[in-house]
Curated annotation (Swiss-Prot):
The lineage of its organism: Eukaryota, Metazoa, Chordata, Craniata, Vertebrata. GO terms for biological process: maintenance of centrosome location; maintenance of Golgi location. This is TBCC domain-containing protein 1. Its main location: cytoplasm. The gene is tbccd1. Disulfide bonds: none annotated. It comes from Xenopus laevis (African clawed frog).
Length: 547
């Protein structure tokens, strides 16, 4: 570290991957979370502190915060899988969970899971970023809009929420405006009573400052290296400003708060910087007759490996296919694409697909969250840690996932189907992202909205409508089959269809056609095939593959 000025910023991942895109439960307010923070500290010997075990969180969530057990597990599992488990630990957990002989044994194993208590409390608190303000203007219209309808309460909520998790300015404002509350949440219970009277006397432990590193990181060398928040706070040249007292190993509450606010800046590795000053990639073709140009930008060549980001926008009427180091471990946003096929065959950190229509998107394994919002008639094919949907219409999802697909508000006509592709590097990419073939919960969605009784939200794809999907590219690798195979009903449907084809081929072979008759028959088959290509719009995909 040199003598340059310290810069601090809000991390992207806690908001992008951790903030569930629904207004938080009423009892996730400061009042109740402060009570929870005091409660867990006074019950350290009961599995509450410094690690909070699932059984105790379930007790607190269901008994005191009055949320149902399914929702309590959703928050716990999200934090654990996204922020605490390594790739190896994820694979180990998949093996343990998939081999449990009974539900009782599974619950017993779950009771052994734990999370960092202070960081988990911060995780619960940042759900407030999606709290709905009735004074906030509705500036976004529904998109796409295949039909006219009056805004519902859930749609008003979604309009206010969907852009915040990617917005660097929202993250900055949240930390800046809520910093006092965040610090208070992490304090010892006995300190809370005096914080408003004499904050200059209060000391914050290094443990609390370390927990703040869940939300904040920074640099002192103009973004060449990213440092942990605690390392910056105890750095000798800034100790006077940060309030660090070497003799006690603690920090002055007042000085620490002032120093953070003074050093806080917009995330230099966020989406704003990526779009403004990132590298423009020539992956997409420019199609004549379109009003807006296709754009692909990344920050891969300018940022540390853990901060990679790729943004794709306005891809239309083409096939875009990439397997690239640029995509590895990147946070990907696919925005306003239409009438196209997109293949991103690399291991990805997270993916958001937003405001797209009439697209087929095939993804490499997504280590954390695959989120689809405000899309119409989109087909998604992927292996992911979690699938979440917000305001989608007539979309199809071929998914392999260890967690239940999460349906927020505004979804209609979603079709869930088994994962059905392979490419040569797929299993290697799954291993890199900590994703296994079991357990697989693709067909058990969790409806996390007020519309849970609406039968039009989702359905399973009937086996007779199911077809396998071929990735039309060659790569080096060992995967030769669909990972995990197909569920029996879908496998049987594919086999029956193949048997009909074999029977038809044998019938043609045994028909004793002359050479002229075979030529005529071939011409008819080709004509019908071309008619089918045009009718199903597969002609466009073939033409774009050739070009």
């Amino acid at each position: 570290m040199d003598g340059s000025r310290v810069q601090l910023w809000a991390k992207t991942d806690p908001f992008l991957l951790g903030a569930l895109q629904m207004p938080p439960p009423a009892k996730f307010s400061m009042h109740y979370l402060r009570k929870m923070a005091s409660y867990v500290r006074t019950r350290a010997t009961e599995g509450c502190y410094p690690r909070l075990y699932w059984a105790m969180w379930r007790h607190i969530a269901c008994g005191k915060l009055q949320i149902v057990e399914e929702t309590a597990w959703l928050y716990f599992e999200t934090f654990l899988s996204v922020f605490e488990r390594s790739v190896a630990q994820s694979l180990d957990w998949a093996e343990v969970a998939s081999t449990c002989p009974s539900s009782e044994k599974y619950e017993e194993i779950k009771s052994q899971l734990s999370v960092d208590t202070l960081k988990f409390i911060l995780f619960l608190y940042i759900q407030q970023i999606n709290k709905i303000s009735l004074r906030a203007p509705m500036i976004e219209s529904e998109w796409p809009s295949p039909r006219s309808r009056s805004p519902t309460p859930d749609f008003v909520a979604q309009s206010s929420i969907y852009n915040k998790v990617w917005d660097d300015y929202s993250h900055y404002n949240f930390i800046h405006n809520h910093l006092t509350y965040i610090l208070e949440l992490l304090m010892e219970p006995k300190q809370l009573s005096i914080v408003t009277q004499s904050s200059h006397c209060i000391l914050i432990s290094a443990e609390v400052v370390n927990a703040l590193g869940f939300l904040i990181e920074g640099t002192v060398d103009k973004n060449r290296a990213v440092n942990h928040f605690l390392d910056l706070a105890v750095w000798q040249p800034v100790q006077i400003k940060s309030g660090f007292i070497e003799t006690s190993g603690a920090f002055s509450f007042q000085k620490l708060q002032a120093w953070i606010k003074e050093c806080l800046v917009i995330n230099p590795f966020g989406i704003t910087a990526c779009i403004k000053s990132g590298t423009k990639l020539s992956w997409a073709q420019q199609v004549d007759g379109l009003n807006k140009r296709a754009k692909v930008a990344c920050n891969t060549y300018k940022v540390p490996h853990t901060h990679r980001m790729v943004v794709m926008s306005q891809i239309s009427k083409q096939t875009l296919a990439k397997s690239s180091k640029t995509l590895v471990d990147a946070r990907v946003k696919i925005h306003r694409c239409s009438d196209c096929y997109i293949y991103l065959l690399s291991p990805l950190r997270s993916v958001t697909v937003e405001k797209c229509q009439n697209c087929t998107i095939i993804l490499g394994p997504v280590q954390t969250v695959l989120h689809i919002q405000m899309c119409y008639n989109v087909k998604i094919i992927a292996v992911c840690q979690r699938l979440s949907l917000l305001s989608t219409t007539n979309c199809t999802f071929h998914i392999l996932t260890p967690t239940r697909p999460l349906f927020y508000c505004g979804n209609q006509g979603a079709v869930l189907a088994p994962f059905h592709i392979r490419y040569s590097m797929l299993e290697d990419h799954m291993a890199q992202t900590g994703l296994a073939t079991v357990p697989n919960s693709w067909d058990r969605p969790f409806l996390f909205s007020t519309e849970s009784n609406n039968s039009n939200i989702w359905r399973l794809m009937p086996p007779e409508d199911f077809f396998t999907f071929v990735v039309p590219f060659e790569m080096e690798g060992d995967t030769t089959e669909i990972p995990g195979g197909l569920p029996p009903a879908y496998s049987n449907s594919v086999q029956q269809r193949q048997q009909k084809i074999h029977t038809w081929q044998k019938t043609v072979k045994d028909a004793g056609l002359t050479r002229e008759q075979r030529k005529q028959f071939q011409a008819v088959v080709e004509m019908k095939f071309n008619e089918w290509l045009s009718k199903t719009e597969n002609r466009h995909q073939l033409d774009s593959l050739v070009s």
